[in-house]
Amino acid sequence: MNSRFKSRLAAALVAVCCSIPFAHANDVTGAGASFVYPVMSKWSADYRGATGKQVNYQSIGSGGGIAQIKAATVDFGSSDAPLKPEELAKYGLAQFPSVIGGVVPIVNVAGVAPGALKLDGPTLAGIFLGRIARWNDPAIVTLNPGLALPDQKITVVHRSDGSGTTFNFVNYLSKVSPEWKAQVGEGTSVPWPAGIGGKGNEGVTAYVKQVKGGIGYVELSYALQNRLAHASLKNAAGRFVQPSEESFAAAAASADWARSRDFFLVMTNAPGEASWPITATNFILVHKQPKNVAGARNARDFFKWVYANGDAQARELDYVPLPDTLVKQIEAYWAQNLTF
């Protein structure tokens, strides 16, 4: 190695070593739900613009986010499947909501416009069980008398990874279909009786776009951004409703957060004539006594900024911001449970 190259290498190493602490001292690392990735990306970009601090969020699914925060390899985890208080206590974790959204069935059927297809819970369960296998099945046709449905195979697309989106979807199916509850049940991963798997909301969206006759389930933003047709669903009040910020907010209005322990609450199949039946909450997980105190504090500060400044970005992407009363409960929870 010649002396000139050695000098250049030494100078480069000095520059890198000196710059890294300053570039990353205020960074935040997070991982988890793809459900929240669209709004998390927007929040992160705006937060960097406002504060100069970087939030690095990996969209790896709720299961991955839970695993990473338990292992303390990130400053925060993100999951649409809340952890029970007993599990939080076991790993020394705190849990609080970030935003509310909705899971929607998406379809790739020629001639079916967004919102035109009507489905109820038992029929949706029958499709994902593989029992209803063609688009002109009488169960679907009966719900859609004015819609021309083809004699076409239904291809079910589900998640292949541990998923909070799946948790809320199958939790809903278990509530509305005894058949589903008995045969499949609920969880972040389930033994799917039919279909193909895609990783993340992104993977399910991509498969449904590619496969004619496909049906899957994703957070609403993925359907809208990819111009995929979504179905309307029959809710607990017996009304067909469209997924929207308004129908998600209607479902969220019934949530009694004050009585929940560690914010453990699932709001699928919520009451109310205007409620979307697969409304879901994204939850943030942090260590109560973190090894990386600075990173945990930076994560808390990021979400404090989100609650104060992130409502417009959430609404722009058809999520529902948390009400002020819930934000105050979260701040009180932080004061009681976080040591940093």
Describe every region a protein language model picked out.
Residues 24-340:
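Flexible loop/hinge segments at secondary-structure junctions
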